[in-house]
Amino acid sequence: RGDRSLTLRPENTASVVRSYLENAIYGKEDVTKYYYNGSMFRYERPQAGRQREFNQIGVEVLGESSPILDAEVIAMSYSLLEKLGITDLEVHINSVGTNASRTKYREMLLNFLEPMKEELCEDCRMRMEKNPLRVLDCKVDKCKELTKDAPSIIDSLNEEERAHYETVKKYLDIFGVKYVEDS
């Protein structure tokens, strides 16, 4: 208020990456793993059920891209929640691939949605223009029913991306993480 400036962190990933870069940790370690827990803040008006201040627990792995590390992060987070007494967990996984795969999926999804466009709610028709993936998030029962057989984003992955995804699933099975595949 007034002439004062107050900075509150909206999330912690940027802080971790900044520290990693500013301290040249990337030159010292092949893989660096971080975890954090703390209060984060939203400036904009929060959506229903959300608060301006919230607690975030996060895990970051920097220095290497690996499906085994992806599975390890998921398994570690899963284990933490179980140890905190949170039971009946359901982990949902998928892969959005690269920009090329996302572009391919966007086209697949639009081809699927176009014949039913007039049956979709007004919000979904607008979403088709801006971000067709959002149509799959619609809460309107009729739209949910119309999109239940939409193509899976997994079908747009190239061979390397699909192998990465399959390896993540393999290691989640090894680590004993129960998961559901979302398309």
Regions from the language model: what does each represent?
Residues 1-183:
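TRNA-recognition modules of translation machinery and tRNA-sensing kinases, especially anticodon-binding
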